[in-house]
From Swiss-Prot:
Bifunctional enzyme involved in de novo IMP synthesis, an essential step for de nove purine synthesis. Residues 294-355, 518-538, 550-569, 575-604 are annotated as: Disordered. Its cofactor is Mg(2+); Mn(2+). It comes from the Eukaryota. Its EC number is 6.3.2.6, 4.1.1.21. Gene3D superfamilies: 3.40.50.1970, 3.40.50.20, ATP-grasp fold, A domain, ATP-grasp fold, B domain, Phosphorylase Kinase, domain 1. This is Bifunctional purine synthesis protein purC/E. In the N-terminal section; belongs to the SAICAR synthetase family. In the C-terminal section; belongs to the AIR carboxylase family. Class I subfamily. Pathway: Purine metabolism; IMP biosynthesis via de novo pathway; 5-amino-1-(5-phospho-D-ribosyl)imidazole-4-carboxylate from 5-amino-1-(5-phospho-D-ribosyl)imidazole (carboxylase route): step 1/1; Purine metabolism; IMP biosynthesis via de novo pathway; 5-amino-1-(5-phospho-D-ribosyl)imidazole-4-carboxamide from 5-amino-1-(5-phospho-D-ribosyl)imidazole-4-carboxylate: step 1/2. It comes from Dictyostelium discoideum (Social amoeba). SUPFAM superfamilies: Glutathione synthetase ATP-binding domain-like (SSF56059), N5-CAIR mutase (phosphoribosylaminoimidazole carboxylase, PurE) (SSF52255), PreATP-grasp domain (SSF52440), Rudiment single hybrid motif (SSF51246), SAICAR synthase-like (SSF56104). It holds the Pfam family PurK_C. Residues 1-305 are annotated as: SAICAR synthetase.
Length: 997
């Protein structure tokens, strides 16, 4: 339950003298306010300690610096929509907070690997980035020095705090809120070019049974590195790193039966004090940065500002915020101690985050209307974008010519129903936007829908030519216009709704990052066909989609018939979606706009976030795992997805295939299958709600849909790796940046570029399409006898690419590959190096292990691990290599040819040849499980295999009609046959494989 804290509470004068001592810790004391027993006074002291209090100093003014830092951090979180216990600052070194029963856990959020994490994970390099941030729990127990605990450890304690049991769901909520809090502060610190490395927070339970962020967040709670430089750190770690007290010149330590006191010299004290003062001052700027957009429109809202629910403490700078009725504050009760464990939790020196106000996005703010059913194909892109940004909306067909009464009613009541903006899409005569603008005072954005006759130019001219005094903000024709109308709407709302502002900033940053990496070559239109089936008899369970209602928690006092009709989402018919008789998720009720329940949820209250279905490992304290029984989504339905699904089933996971093909190979073994184009965002929304993690079977999938999924569900490997591997120029540039050799290359964007490039590279050379090439498609070997213009046309036409890459032709001894697995916790392994033989550019045979010198095996492993670490891989990646022999020395060396961030054809032999196959290893990686052994099934290492001269394992692809020899293959001793059930056995098509041991 969320309760507003109004100005009466914020402006209330508390009797600070009438108080009762509750508890004290190393750095603060907590008092019960007797006349306001639902509140406490938290008073900081000037002590600074390290080593669980083993050494202690008194730092001048630390009490003021700590309180200032804490209060400012709470304000940042309030502005970001995160609930905390903070009410107001009442003294330079004290603030009022809501009373709550403290959960005896610290939640640690790590962006970079450093400190104690490195001591426990020696294989991880300092500075390794965790994305998403890594979450750890410690149990508050001074005797045991706050040990690291797993979720299972916590659940076995059977904790019940404030009458609320500590369940797996509640722990998931703490992870989610802690992550949001970290990201809000991280974003604010970035504005000052400071890296927030990690922090720790605590939670409490209010008297209303509500989970809330509590305690303090000061300079003892985090690591911050200005300019990302550890040597410039300003946090408490500087104090921890100072030499032992007895060896400190100028210090006068006291060691009598307790902590080591007065360990610092005057010079050291001054340095630490300066750091704490700098941090306290800097956090003022964090508040300014976070509140900037909220304050931009302050002058336009002075008439409303007296009613603001502003829960920030009083300072010399007034943060007057626009009056938005849906902004409320949630009270958080603090430090109500019932027993020993809770008392300990309330007095620790670790700090918690608080925020006072949260935007309640519980009714539509934007109305999306269109003239007809056919306009939905365009207008749903506006709906998709609003979904991404967390903006609640409604959608309705309102024809200016065929339903004028409906139009009049809709426009006239739009403002009274709480809408702030209307997006109107229409084609042809396109009168809808203008007529709505004439009837409502709300801003109207007009989207010209592309018409068959004049390609939308008629629509554009009809909308844009409005007379003076009746404005319609007109955007581009078609898809771009629909998307931009949604973005403009979000930009208008952002100053009043912090969660929308944050989402919009993240969206813009992602757009910038994408453009900086690589432009999109081949955008395709959204599909209109989606079908979900299973291997059992399928039945429809989503018929409610066609007439669902907005989950709008508006007041029921005026719910007359007209309001009820307007709350109903009357939408164009969605794609047909059939699902399995076994319910996939209970949350399938949703608006036909691809927004859950037609409603943008607040940034705290979302039930599902990308890692919300992961839990802490029961045996590895730092690890997140997805438990068996969960569903793994796989983009693609070919043989790789098929073998992934089989491996997943072996470990107890369900799989859900998403692909556009009819009767895909993987559908025969997967639990669920969705038939849809990859850029059907409505289908992707449903898919994301039905799975717990997503991976993909091939790298030539469109990146944008994969990136879209990351907002709703964890996707591994990261789509950024996908972008790199799809673009050969970007891929080779990345590899060379790691000082790993590749063939010389030149980017080619035109025939003239090709002529210039061949002069630099020389003959012979290989011309390849820059994207989408596979199994020899889109490439030509160039000699001085080849017509360059014809080669250019062939390469670009075969793959519909607009760019190419010209590579130096490498005279290699053989081709090889190494597959690297890297888990969610950063552990990593390489499969044995193999050599590959091709026929007509298609892999024919793989020999494992490669019959090459041991130093080449070592070099391949080093290359693979370097690539995996550098791109933050979670999953598996195959590194295709050229083995080059120096004819003078007889020495071999390796050059990287290509990367594939998925299971690889050259790894199929691992199904029978290794203890853990590449497919099982992928499942382990994306689900956070421990990596499996990559030893041969003979239980010997790669080096032992080579030394004992055991005959290699051979995997042979069955191409085309070769699969018809399946019976003969089965008669061969030591053969393991895999048939992919792919239909027509076309020439060169991979129909199966056989592994011989």
């Amino acid at each position: 339950m969320t309760t507003a804290i109004n100005n009466n509470i914020v402006n209330k004068e508390f009797d600070l003298k009438d108080k009762t001592f509750l508890a004290s810790g190393k750095t603060k004391t907590i008092y019960q306010l007797n006349k306001e027993d639902q509140y406490v006074l938290i008073e900081s002291n000037s002590a600074i300690t390290a080593g669980d209090g083993a050494k202690k100093d008194i730092l001048p003014n630390k009490d003021i610096y700590s309180t200032t830092t804490t209060v400012n951090n709470f304000k940042v979180l309030q502005l970001s929509g995160i609930n905390t216990h903070f009410v107001k600052q009442v003294e330079p070194n004290a603030f009022i907070a809501k009373k709550c029963s403290m959960i005896p856990l610290e939640v640690i959020v790590r962006r970079l690997a450093t400190g104690s994490y490195l001591k426990r994970n020696t294989h991880v390099t300092e500075g390794t980035k965790f994305n998403p941030p890594l979450i750890e729990f410690t149990f508050k127990d001074d005797v045991q020095h706050d040990p690291l605990v797993t979720e299972q450890d916590i659940l076995e304690m059977n904790l019940k705090i404030g009458g609320v049991p500590i369940t797996s769901k509640l722990l998931s909520q703490t992870r989610h809120i802690a992550t949001l809090s970290f990201e809000a502060l991280e974003r604010a610190w970035q504005s000052l070019d400071v890296t927030l490395v990690d922090f720790k927070v605590e939670f409490g339970i209010t008297s209303q049974g509500e989970l809330i962020l509590a305690d303090v967040i000061d300079n003892d709670s985090w690591r911050i590195w200005p300019k990302g430089d550890k040597t410039l750190m300003k946090d408490k770690q500087v104090y921890r790193n100072l030499p032992s007290a007895l060896n400190t010149p100028g210090a006068t330590p006291t060691t009598q039966s307790g902590p080591l006191l007065n360990t610092l010299s005057d010079q050291q004290l001054k340095m630490i004090e300066d750091n704490y003062a700098w941090v306290a001052t800097s956090t003022e700027k964090l508040v300014e940065f976070t509140a900037a957009n909220l304050n931009n429109n302050n002058n336009n809202n002075n008439n409303n500002s007296n009613n603001n629910n502003n829960n920030t403490s009083s300072t010399s700078r007034s943060n007057s915020l626009p009056n938005v009725p849906s902004i409320t504050t949630t009270p958080t009760l603090h430090h109500h101690h019932h027993h020993h464990q809770q008392q300990q939790s309330g007095v620790g020196n670790n700090n918690n985050v608080n925020s006072g106000f949260q935007v309640q996005l519980n009714q539509p703010l934007v109305g999306i209307i269109m003239g007809s059913q056919s306009d939905w194909e365009t207008m749903k892109l506006a709906a998709n974008t609003l979904t991404t940004l967390g903006v609640p909306f409604e959608t309705r067909i309102v024809s200016a010519h065929r339903t004028p009464d409906r139009l009049f009613e809709y426009a006239k009541t739009a403002k009274s129903r709480g809408l702030k903006i209307v997006i109107a899409g229409a084609g042809g005569a396109a009168h809808l936007p203008g007529m709505v603008a004439a009837l409502t005072p709300l801003p109207v954005f007009g989207v010209p829908v592309q018409s068959k006759a004049l390609s939308g130019v008629d629509s554009l001219l009809s909308i844009v030519q409005m007379p003076a005094g009746i404005p319609v903000g007109t955007v581009a024709i078609g898809a771009a216009g629909a998307t931009n109308a949604a973005l403009l709407s979000a930009a208008v709302l952002a100053p009043y709704y912090p969660s929308i502002e944050l989402s919009l900033d993240l969206y813009r940053k992602k757009q910038t990052d994408a453009v900086a990496e690589i432009p999109v070559d081949n955008p395709t239109s959204t599909s209109t066909t989606t079908t979900t089936t299973t291997t059992s008899n399928a039945t429809s369970i989503l018929s409610a989609i066609h007439t669902s209602t907005i989950n709008s928690n508006t007041s029921s006092h005026n719910n007359n018939q007209q309001q009820q009709q307007q709350q109903q989402t009357i939408l164009p018919t969605q794609p047909t979606i059939i699902n399995t008789p076994t319910p996939v998720r209970s949350s399938v009720s949703r608006s036909q706009s691809p927004l859950p329940s037609g409603n943008g949820s607040s940034i705290i209250s979302q039930e599902k976030t990308p890692l919300s279905t992961f839990v802490l490992s029961t045996c590895r304290p730092s690890a997140l795992v997805l438990p068996p029984g969960s569903t793994i989504g796989i983009l693609g339905g070919g043989q790789l997805a098929r073998m992934m699904a089989i491996a997943a089933a072996q470990l107890g996971y369900k799989t859900h295939i998403f692909c556009p093909e009819n009767d895909p190979s993987a559908s025969h073994v997967a639990t669920y299958t969705t038939k849809s184009n990859y850029n059907n965002y409505s289908a992707l929304d449903i898919f994301a709600r039905q799975v717990d993690v997503v991976t993909y079977e091939f790298e030539n999938i469109m990146v944008e849909p994969v990136e879209y999924l990351t907002k709703q569900v964890a996707v591994f490997p990261d789509p950024k790796i996908l972008r790199t591997c799809q673009d050969r120029v970007l891929e080779k540039t990345f590899i060379q940046s790691l000082d790993i050799p590749t063939a010389q290359f030149q980017s080619v964007e035109s025939f003239n570029d090709l002529k210039s490039a061949i002069e630099k590279i020389g003959y012979p050379a290989i011309l390849k399409s820059n994207t989408m090439g596979y199994d020899g498609k889109g490439q030509v070997k160039l000699t001085d006898q080849v017509d360059l213009e014809q080669a250019w046309k062939k390469v670009t036409s075969e793959t519909c690419a607009t760019k190419a890459i010209l590579e130096q032709y490498i005279e290699f001894e053989s081709e090889a590959s190494v597959i690297v697995a890297r888990a969610l916790d950063g552990t990593e392994l390489t499969f044995p190096l193999v050599t590959n033989k091709h026929r007509n550019h298609i892999l024919r045979q793989t020999i494992a292990p490669a019959q090459l010198p041991e130093y080449i095996h070592k070099q391949a492993n080093e290359i693979g691990l370097k690539i995996a670490r550098s791109n933050g891989l979670v999953g598996i990646i195959a590194v295709e290599l050229f083995v080059v022999k120096n004819n003078e020395t007889g020495q071999y060396s390796l050059m990287v040819n290509e990367l594939a961030p998925r299971p690889h054809n050259s790894g199929h032999w691992t199904i029978e040849g290794c203890v853990t196959s590449q497919f099982e290893q992928l499942i382990r990686c994306v689900c956070g499980l421990p990596l499996g052994s990559v030893d041969f099934t003979k239980r010997i290492s790669e080096a032992e295999f080579i030394q004992q001269q055991i005959p290699p394992i051979v995997m042979t692809n069955l191409l085309g009609q070769e699969v018809n020899g399946w019976e003969k293959i089965l008669q061969t001793k030591g053969s393991h046959l895999h048939i992919y059930a792919k239909g027509d056995a076309k020439e060169g098509r991979k129909m199966g494989h056989v592994t011989q041991q």
